[in-house]
Amino acid sequence: MLRDYDIIAIQEVVAGYGGAQAVARLTDELNIKGNKWDYVISDKTRSNPYKTERYAFIWNMNKLKKIGKAWLEKKYQLKIEREPFFCTFQYKNKQFTVVNFHAITKDKQPETEIKYFKFFPEEYPNLNLIFAGDFNCPQSHTVFNPLKKMGYQSILVNQKTSLRQAFKNGKCLASEFDNMYYKTSKINTINSGIIPFHKNFNSLKEARIISDHIPICFEFSLN
């Protein structure tokens, strides 16, 4: 499933040593399957010990080049519990930066964190930003309006991405939380959607051992 894509952005990597080991093992498995893959893992986020985690990127080195060092956002780290992880990649002669993010849970009001994202395009005017991850907030929320007014657009609309513990009315997806946002003047969408990996398992319980969210995907070209 993963080897069909060139970048994999991962949230909720365990902050302890085991999390980094798991990402390394996944990268090793991809290398066995073909192509040459590498990975980068963030430092621990500056959140309380019960909420801290790491982010990770895995990328296909035959297609992409990582530019410089990846970094955790510092300016708003006291405002955002798990500050986003930035990494710049180059495809041929064009660059883009993926902003990997995991928001606080819905009951904690993730919009109080997401509202700071409107400052990132001005803070990094030379970067072609793609915001990606688990926002715990639907794209229809007004907190995304400032980004939309700047020309950013979500790759998914009305697409639920979290897995229920059991089917309800024949449906297993619960909430519209995961998405990506890109600037339409700099990026063209070729394809976007979800990867319904849970259909490969005998039950939702089995699938949720892997993840309680389904992966989302974005195929694009750079202007």
Which stretches of residues belong to each language-model region?
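Structured beta-strand-rich core segments of catalytic domains in phosphoester-bond hydrolases
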Residues: 14-94
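Surface-exposed cleft-lining segments at the edges of enzyme active sites
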Residues: 72-75, 99-108
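His/acidic metal-ligating clusters that form di-metal
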Residues: 111-132
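Conserved hydrophobic/aromatic beta-strand scaffold that supports enzyme active sites
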Residues: 55-57, 84-88, 100, 179-180, ...
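Loop/turn elements at helix/coil->beta-strand transitions in domains of secreted/extracellular proteins
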Residues: 3-7, 33-38, 92-97, 124-129, ...
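Stable alpha-helical elements in mature extracytoplasmic
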Residues: 9, 19-26, 54, 110-117, ...
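Active-site metal-binding loops of divalent metal-dependent hydrolases
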Residues: 12-13, 103, 133-135
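Metal-dependent phosphoester-hydrolase catalytic domains
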Residues: 16, 122-129, 137-223
